[in-house]
Amino acid sequence: MANIKSAKKRAVQSEKARKHNASRRSMMRTFIKKVYAAIEAGDKAAAQKAFNEMQPIVDRQAAKGLIHKNKAARHKANLTAQINKLA
């Protein structure tokens, strides 16, 4: 454990940020999983609706630095391609 006051404060702040980031990352993954579930079910309308809900969430997390912008773009591109493949 840290002995210096500023190091103790940083440890507390880091733990708080870690929990916040974990929560946001989990939320984002849940939205992505909803899109995959709709695709697996073969329901294009539900998949498109879930994608439209997921897209701003992923973009926001990329803008805030939680994930890299290229990872956000990759998620969106892959899901869009899979949705477009549905009949």
Curated annotation (Swiss-Prot):
It comes from the Bacteria. InterPro entries: Ribosomal_bS20, Ribosomal_bS20_sf. GO terms for cellular component: cytosol; small ribosomal subunit. Keywords: Ribonucleoprotein, Ribosomal protein, RNA-binding, rRNA-binding. Transmembrane segments: none annotated. One of its GO terms (biological process) is translation. GO terms for molecular function: small ribosomal subunit rRNA binding; structural constituent of ribosome. Residues 1-26 are annotated as: Disordered. NCBIfam families: S20. Binds directly to 16S ribosomal RNA. Belongs to the bacterial ribosomal protein bS20 family. This is Small ribosomal subunit protein bS20. It comes from Klebsiella pneumoniae (strain 342).
